[in-house]
Amino acid sequence: MSNKEKGVNVQVLLRCRPFSNDELRNNAPQVVTCNDYQREVAVSQNIAGKHIDRIFTFDKVFGPSAQQRDLYDQAIVPIVNEVLEGFNCTIFAYGQTGTGKTYTMEGECKRSKSGPNGELPQEAGVIPRAVKQVFDTLESQNAEYSVKVTFLELYNEEITDLLAPEDLKVALEDRQKKQLPLMEDGKGGVLVRGLEEEIVTSANEIFTLLERGSAKRRTAETLLNKQSSRSHSLFSITIHIKEATPEGEELIKCGKLNLVDLAGSENISRSGAREGRAREAGEINKSLLTLGRVINALVEHLGHIPYRDSKLTRLLRDSLGGRTKTCIIATVSPAVHCLEETLSTLDYAHRAKNIKNKPEVNQKMMKSTLIKDLYGEIERLKAEVYAAREKNGVYIPKERYYQEENERKAMADQIEQMGVSIENHQKQFEELQSRHDSQVQQCSDLTCKLDVTQKQLNQTSKLLAYTEEQLRQSQYTLKERDFIISEQKKAENALAHQACVLRADLEKSIQENASLFQKIAREDKLSTDNRSLVNNFQAELAKQLGSLSSTLATSVCRQTEHLQCVEKFCHNFLDSHDKAVLDLKRKINSSMALYISHFEAMQNVVRLHKATSNATLEEVSTLASSNSISTKEFLDAEAVEANSMFDELQSTLSTHQGEMAHFARELRQRFNDSTEHLTNISAIIQRFFDKLLDESKRLEKHATTVDEIQTNSIAEFEKAYEEQSKSDAEKLIADVTSLVSNHMRRQKELVGARLVDLRETVSGNRTFLDGHVSSMEGITTDAKRKWQDFYMQAEGETKENADFSAAKHCRMESLMQKCVSTAETALKRWQSTHELVNDMGNQHVLTMHSVVRNICDNNEQHVTDFDSTRESAEEDVKRNSEDIIKSIDSLSGEERGSISGVLDTTSAHSETLDVLKKDHCMQSTSIEQIALETFQQKYMDYEPTGATPIRSEPDVPSKVTIESLRAMPMEVLLEEFRENNSFESFQVKEVKPSLIPRSPFSQINN
């Protein structure tokens, strides 16, 4: 589809005037911003408290600082040039009143003659500048031309001719301003009947007419503009230019420029229009609204365009959607009080951009045709003038006359078009005739050329025979050369093939070398990673083993100190216990010896009394009294000694109780210290705990053996002691003195022997334990490298040991309380014995008095009483001995309990060692898993990728093979070819005719 069928969009320009003096004084806000370079206009709005900018884009934008010359040079000059090319063009200004439409179109025309050389002032508008450009261009082209102008005004839907003579104007006013009618021209346009056309020859004449017509325009003062145009004006310039064709014919080119200054739309409330001015504003707005509806209909491509709703739209019909090029200049105000009209103007102008016109160049007319038409028009006008003057013409109704006139003009146009068509056909015939004549001339020329060519053909035949012989020789030579070339090509192909094979082998070798280098790089990287992994593992292992060694050394020292403390406590306890037993035995022996000596003294006194009873009765009574007193003193002394002994025993037990409490506190403190140190002990001690478990089992077995030996020894001691006590008790009746002495001696010897055995056993056990401790130290030294942390398990076991120590402490305190209660029981028993002895002494005194009184009569009875007293004393001694044995048994039981407590403690430590063994197993397993994961999973072995090339031997061609690929010398090849192909048998091949025409050699040579 051509541009003519598509159409051309209406060009829309936007011009924003600067602020007026009143607006500057009132500091009116600016709501319109122009961007000349991007051809955009931004309008600021506040809608519902929000600031919104609307942006419109036009073909060209001129801001407040733009001058009249800038607008004309950039936008109007091309349009005027198109008018001179034969187009019809329209320029009209559209916008609110007071925005500079008339200033843009007309400017200051009155000053146009004041400049030098007829130059226009800076304020000159589009119309004077267009007129000056038209005449300047025509004068520069030295063309023959004629220019006609018309100037009409549309006021309240009435058309007035602004160029009509003054007398005619008065006549029209006298006839109540008869308006000029609009008529259809039969070509889709309109014409104004009776409109005066002024022929002008210079720009100054047009300026004069323009000033005269502008002075007649209706203007009025409003609040928005002191000289507001109250009507629309249309200034038309019609140009006829004569052109000469190459054939010498003269044609007339016609162009028309319509310059429209529209009245401004206005808001009556802001413009202050009243009564007549309000009606004028209403008519103006009505015509502008119709123009807006026409624009909308054209943009939306509606079926009906309301051109006939207003005379303004009828006048602009060809400019909006017709065959005219149109330019719209939209003028706006930057002030905020004109925002509504500004937005309306911008909306209509933006929509008008989408209107498409289909401009056409006006058909050129022949000068003769134009003159003929003009003569006919003159004759018609003369006839009309004559008929009007003579009043003898035909009078018909006005409507019929207009209709016939329109039909006549339409027929005239058709006749004119047919004449033009006939002329075109005549031209085509003349062109065909000239072509025929030229073809005949060409035919005669070709005949002459044919004769000349025949002569040249004969000469060429002779030359051809000679040339064929030369050609035969040349072809034979070429055949030889072809044979040589083919042989060399074969050799070349063989060499090229061998080179390709060698190149393929070389590429394969390069690829294999690259694969080998990649493999070496992978192996190097893998070795580096494995070396780094092993170094890190070795450093971490050394760090953990160093920590294990230091922690193990500290723990071993603590355990050794703890065992030494326990051993020291046991030795101290045994020493103090041995001292207490020996002291108790010594005091009992001394008491028994003193008692026996006094008892023997009593026996001697009794015997003496029996011998001298008859002679010394009075002395017996005295001796009895003294005996009673001495016995009382003896018992008092013995009581004092017994009390001191029991006080000493009680103090000893108190000391033991304090030592046990101190031991418990020290043990608890050591367990706490052990807890703090055991939190840092590691668990990888499998071999150590295996050996330690064996040693513990041996130690436990030895302790069990020692315990059994001690138990058997104590049982044998008890059994021997009981047997000896029974035998001594039986013999005591016969001989009390010897019995008690032997009994105490044997008891001392037996106890001493047992104590010696116990000391030897303890010494042996100590030696055995020292040996095992040294063995354990050796084992510990070997296991120092394998410890790890087991914080949570050791902490739990430490708490259990602390609880166990607390329980043992409570147990020891209960035993000490039991010892204290036993001592108190012995004290009470001794006091009861002391009282019993006192009672017996008193009874003995009374008996002695009775014996003294009845000594002679009851001597035998005294002996009997003495025997009974002796038996009672023996029973008391026996009972006292049994109590002492029971006390010793109780003490032995407590010793066994203490030993069993020590064994329990040892067993608890053995259990702790078992737990440590289990933890060590777990930690050892963990380290083994870490090592396994490090050396089996993380430690990467090289895995073959399958891309490593297999060793292969290259196929290297031999030197003989390479030499065989050489081509034979040229002389040998020529000799071989000539033997197989003689020159006499060689036939010349038929030469194909060349498709490219060539000149004969003779012509080339000549």
From Swiss-Prot:
Family assignment from sequence similarity: Belongs to the TRAFAC class myosin-kinesin ATPase superfamily. Kinesin family. KIN-5/BimC subfamily.
Organism per entry: Nicotiana tabacum (Common tobacco)
Keyword Ubl conjugation in annotation: no
Q: Which residues bind ATP?
A: G95, Q96, T97, G98, T99, G100, K101, T102
Q: Where is the Kinesin motor domain?
A: 9-355
Q: Which GO terms describe its cellular component?
A: cytoplasm; mitotic spindle; spindle microtubule
What is its subcellular localisation?
Answer: Cytoplasm; Cytoplasm, Cytoskeleton; Cytoplasm, Cytoskeleton, Spindle
The coding gene here is KIN5C
What processes in GO biological process is this protein linked to? microtubule-based movement; mitotic spindle assembly; spindle elongation
Asked if the record carries the keyword Plastid, the reply is: no
User: What does the function comment of this entry state?
Assistant: Responsible for microtubule translocation. May be important for the organization of phragmoplast-specific arrays of microtubules. Plays an essential role in stabilizing the mitotic spindle. Required during mitotic cytokinesis.
Output the SMART domains linked to this UniProt entry. KISc (SM00129)
Coiled-coil segments on the chain, per record: 371-522
Q: Which PROSITE patterns match?
A: KINESIN_MOTOR_1, KINESIN_MOTOR_2
Protein name in UniProt: Kinesin-like protein KIN-5C
- Cite a single GO MF annotation: plus-end-directed microtubule motor activity
Q: Name one Pfam family in it.
A: Kinesin
Listed A to Z, the keywords are: ATP-binding, Coiled coil, Cytoplasm, Cytoskeleton, Microtubule, Motor protein, Nucleotide-binding
